[in-house]
Amino acid sequence: MLLADFLKQSTSRLTKLYGEQEARAIINLLCKARFGTSTYTHIVEPSYKVPEDTVSEELQRLEKGEPIQYVLGFAEFMGQRFRVEPGALIPRPETEILCCEAIKYAKLKTRTINILDLCTGSGCIAWSVATALPNSRVIGVDISEKALSIAQNQNFKIPNPPSFIKGNILTDNILEGHKFDLILSNPPYILTSDKARMQTNVTDYEPEIALYVPDNEPLIFCQAIADLSRRLLKQDGIGIMEIHEELGNQILNLFKNKNFENTEIIQDQFKKNRFIRYSRSSE
């Protein structure tokens, strides 16, 4: 089949679920991964043909709403290809800002940096900062054995790969005796009541344990991370956490009341309140 025809037909199959623009983007990702084509191949090479039968099963999965990243088995993040599958949250582009802020801070230091990644999931944050900071020591923590298996088996060869441990940050007294220069986290923060307004490609496929917090305890993970940071963060260390865009002021006040200094909100590329940055007080 001509690539141009394949793009048109396949996009049409997904348009009802995603809208035309997002459907086209998904099909372009599929074609790039499976056929090695670019966004413009069908224009510069009008006679270019593709073996459409080889992706028929994957198209059916996409039609059912399965995320393209799970279908392909990978997601692009921080310029690298991460293994993803059901059981770990798919990395989002906005989370790259958290990594960039952490790397920028760490590069100001001349010593070895100790970094903790809470709710590590696929390990995309842990691996990204470890790759950019070859002299760092990175530990990732997650409650899910499935997520930890995915994180541990990312295919990167770097001098100091992250280590990963199982832990429940809400109940476990993790990493007693350790101190960290950086504590990073992308914890669950979506209100359970928001689920009804979300796309089914998220709600039906990505792990609920990595997404949702109870409506009556929206700051449950923020509280736990603040308490852990009081115990595990070095005096001159900082924390960066991804947050719910509508709860920024509440989270900011929580950390201020815990006597953290230099607390501030960082916006994402869409000008939404997406992260909080904080540092230990000198007391």
Q: Can you name each region flagged by the protein language model?
A:
Residues 14, 106, 155, 229, ...:
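Conserved hydrophobic residues forming the short capping helix/wall of the S-adenosyl-L-methionine
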Residues 81, 137, 161-163, 261-264:
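Conserved beta-strand segments of alpha/beta enzyme cores
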Residues 215-279:
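Conserved Class I SAM-dependent methyltransferase catalytic core
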Residues 189-221:
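Mobile active-site "lid"/loop adjacent to the S-adenosyl-L-methionine
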Residues 97-197, 224:
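Conserved SAM/SAH cofactor-binding pocket of Class I
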Residues 1-43:
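Non-catalytic accessory regions of SAM-dependent methyltransferases
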Residues 30, 65, 95, 125, ...:
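Residue-level signal for inorganic ion chemistry
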Residues 29-105:
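Conserved AdoMet
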